[in-house]
Design a protein with these regions (language model features):
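Conserved beta-strand and immediately adjacent loop positions that scaffold enzyme active sites
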Residues: 88, 185, 324-326, 341
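Residue-level signal for alpha-helical context at structural boundaries
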Residues: 207, 294, 320, 360-361
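C-terminal nuclease/phosphodiesterase catalytic domains that cleave nucleic-acid phosphodiester bonds
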Residues: 17-22, 278-279, 312, 332-369
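Acidic side chains
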Residues: 159-160, 315, 321, 338
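Phosphate/NTP-binding elements of NTP-utilizing enzymes
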Residues: 1-314
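Metal-dependent catalytic core segments for phosphate chemistry
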Residues: 319-331
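Short, solvent-exposed secondary-structure capping/transition elements
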Residues: 47-51, 322, 354-355
Length: 369
């Protein structure tokens, strides 16, 4: 069910705020179409009892599309205008500095809004904004404070979820912390990351499955802006598909320049794909484009490798598992160089905490660590 008045209330509140950065500083918000849709959908879609339908919103979008501004605006709305007495709203990120980015934007927005400025008491040393009429507050937390149990959460703004070192803060803030509230909102906003064993990729997969119709969760609102793995990363029409603010807050020339630099320097390609096009890449810096690497592939006959000079390389992961074990056979006057990947281990999240012995045994391998 859609409540136009509630949607309009949220949109009007945010549009009365002002931008805080660069040439946009002091300019009224005036939500862009993609932002307007997100706000209306989240705050205007309600259940039969009139409370919000969505308690989790996941927005994945490339850098410089205004993530911090929209996140700060939502934080202020939840704190001041959501008709919730004693609302506790938390800004979360991987570290205090990252979490402070959205908070600092919110502080600047308050400073530029006389109506909020006379009602909000900032406690900068604690990274806290107190909305005095309702006894509500917006407070910064980070992964360094993940043991903060016992919170009565009305709202969580999770900035750059992909940077979380583990899932502990996410679980503490989203699993049961808002049960005493009628319509808590967990607003997760991030750029794509590089770790496909992370909590962010787990949520990304859920969002993607819901968008594809493979899963259903009526309380989860997914938004993903980006290009697919099979899309041409050099096509400008794909840049617009991934960047809804392109041409508004992002000059197209900036993206063209970044693309040209990445095309000339393969080490920058994955950074461009991840940050500009919101692709989940395997690492932020790529030594060689994969299409060039793939051209070096040829069929290897193991029998012909017997007796040849050989060197082994073992790459250990940061935990207990093996990333890769590679055998390299130097070229001879009549033979090419050969490389054979003997072992690649990518442990599933579900077995990450098992002993390494049991993991290897289950996969028919012997542990030698």
């Amino acid at each position: 069910m859609y409540d136009e008045k509630k949607a309009e209330r949220a949109v009007n509140f945010i549009n009365n705020l002002k931008h805080t950065k660069g040439v946009w500083h002091g300019v009224p918000f005036d939500l862009l179409p993609w932002q307007d849709k997100i706000i209306r959908d989240i705050f205007g879609t309600v259940k039969d009892d009139g409370y919000r339908k969505y308690n989790t919103a996941y927005v994945e979008i490339p850098k410089k599309n205004g993530k911090s501004e929209i996140a700060a605006a939502i934080a202020l709305y939840l704190t001041c205008a959501d008709s919730e007495w004693g609302a506790e709203v938390y800004g979360c990120a991987a570290d205090r500095q990252q979490a402070s980015i959205v908070f600092d934007v919110a502080v600047d927005m308050v400073d530029q809004c006389p109506a909020l400025k006379k009602r909000i008491k900032p406690i900068i040393s604690q990274k806290r904004l107190v909305y005095m009429p309702f006894g509500s507050f917006y407070q910064v937390l980070s992964s360094e404070a993940f043991s903060k149990h016992g919170l009565n959460v009305h709202g969580v703004i999770f900035d750059e979820l992909h940077a979380q070192p583990n899932r502990e803060l996410f679980d503490v803030m989203t699993k049961g912390s808002g049960d005493a509230r009628m319509q808590p909102l967990f607003f997760l906003i991030t750029t794509a990351g590089t770790d496909r064993n992370s909590i962010c990729y787990e949520v990304h997969q859920k969002a993607d499955d819901i968008l594809r119709g493979k899963k259903h969760d009526s309380t989860f609102y997914p938004v993903i802006y980006g290009i697919k793995d099979e899309d041409d990363w050099g096509l400008e029409e794909n840049w617009y598909k991934a960047n809804p603010s392109l041409g508004h807050t992002i000059p197209i020339k900036k993206v063209r320049d970044a693309f040209n630099s990445a095309r000339e320097n393969p080490a920058e390609e994955n950074i461009f794909r991840q940050l500009r096009l919101n692709q989940w890449v395997k690492q932020s810096v790529r030594w060689m484009p994969m299409d060039i690497w793939d051209k070096c592939s040829f069929e290897v006959n193991p029998e012909k490798l017997k007796g040849r000079e050989c060197y082994g390389g073992l790459d250990l992961s940061s935990t207990n598992d093996i990333t890769a074990f590679v055998l390299v056979f130097p070229p001879t006057p009549t033979e090419k160089i050969d490389g054979a990947v003997a072992l690649i281990m990518a442990l599933d999240r579900s077995i990450r905490h098992e002993s390494k012995e049991s993991v290897y045994e289950k996969r028919g391998m012997r542990s030698f660590l």
